[in-house]
Amino acid sequence: MVKMSHGPRSGSRRKLTKSKEERKKSIIGRMMQEFSPGDRVAIDIEPSVHNGMPYHRFQGYTGIVEGAQGNCYKVGVKVGSLTKYVIASPVHLKRIKG
């Protein structure tokens, strides 16, 4: 038997795979976006950029930007009754209007 991998990307093939249309798009605009505290964002992981990538469990979660931490942003995400904090690069975040 082969030992099962327990790395940070294990079990995430479907979540971290781009479609043909997504492979053609440029991500430079998403890399340069800026957020201010209080902005609502969705975590949308960009699989081609590994720096500042949040854990794949948080793919699709929404939260509020708490502040900047280095080149990344600290996002408060509600999981049940808890607020968990995810540190993610701006390329892995999308602004939610509203």
From Swiss-Prot:
Family to which the UniProt record says this protein belongs: Belongs to the eukaryotic ribosomal protein eL21 family.
Domain of life: Archaea
Protein name per UniProt: Large ribosomal subunit protein eL21
Record NCBIfam families: PRK04306.1
Any one GO cellular component localisation term in the record: ribonucleoprotein complex
Alphabetized Gene3D superfamilies for the sequence: Ribosomal protein L21
SUPFAM superfamilies per record: Translation proteins SH3-like domain (SSF50104)
Region (Disordered): 1-31
Gene Ontology biological process terms in this record: translation
Entry-linked InterPro entries: Ribosomal_eL21 (IPR001147), Ribosomal_eL21_arc (IPR022856), Ribosomal_eL21_CS (IPR018259), Ribosomal_eL21_sf (IPR036948), Translation_prot_SH3-like_sf (IPR008991)
Keyword tags: Ribonucleoprotein, Ribosomal protein
Family matches, as Pfam families: Ribosomal_L21e
GO molecular function: structural constituent of ribosome
